[in-house]
UniProtKB/Swiss-Prot annotation:
Residues 97-169 form the PRC barrel domain. Binds ribosomal protein uS19. SUPFAM superfamilies: PRC-barrel domain, Translation proteins. Belongs to the RimM family. The gene is rimM. This is Ribosome maturation factor RimM. An accessory protein needed during the final step in the assembly of 30S ribosomal subunit, possibly for assembly of the head region. Essential for efficient processing of 16S rRNA. May be needed both before and after RbfA during the maturation of 16S rRNA. It has affinity for free ribosomal 30S subunits but not for 70S ribosomes. InterPro entries: PRC_barrel-like_sf (IPR011033), PRC_RimM (IPR056792), RimM (IPR011961), RimM_N (IPR002676), RimM_N_sf (IPR036976), Transl_B-barrel_sf (IPR009000). Keywords: Chaperone, Cytoplasm, Ribosome biogenesis, rRNA processing.
Amino acid sequence: MSQDFVEIAKIGATYKLNGELNLYSLANSIETLLSYGDWYIQLPATNVWQQLKGESVLKRADKVYIKLANINNADTAKKYVNALIGVPKRALPQLAEDEVYFKDLIGCSVKNINNDSFGVVVDIIETGANEVLVCKEDNSEYLIPYVKQYIVSEDLNSKKIVVDWEYDY
C-alpha cells in the first residue's frame, strides 16, 4: 500500500440490486471508520488511490453499507468488490510519544534480549486486558503480551522489536 494512505475498510459483496456494497471496517470501530472525512478507494487490480465519490453510507446494527455515486446496479458494483478504502495518513489523530498504530507493528521482526528470534508480527489479538503480538517464525507461532513490562524497545522505522520474553513462557 502507498505510504501516504492507511487502509480503514474493505468492500465486500454487493448488497441489494441498486448497487450498494458491504463495507468491512478495518478500524477499531464503525464509529471510527465513519469519523474520517474524505475516503479514497484502491481497486483490486491497481495500486492507485482515487478519491471516493460516495452517495451514501448506511449503518445497520454492526454492518455498514456504501452506495457509490453513479453505480445503480449490482453488476456495475461488482467491479468494486475487494477494493480497499483508505484515508491519508495525515487524517489520523496525532499519537502520544508512547503510542503506536497497531498496523505499524505488523511485519516487525521480534527478538528477545538474548537475540533469540520470534519471527515477525503477523497479527495482533485484542484480549480486553491487553493486546497480544502474534509472531511467526518458520512453522512456530509465538504469542507475546504487548505490555510495557515485556517490550524493551521498538524501532518502527527499522521494523524491529526487542522483548523480555522466552520461548518457554
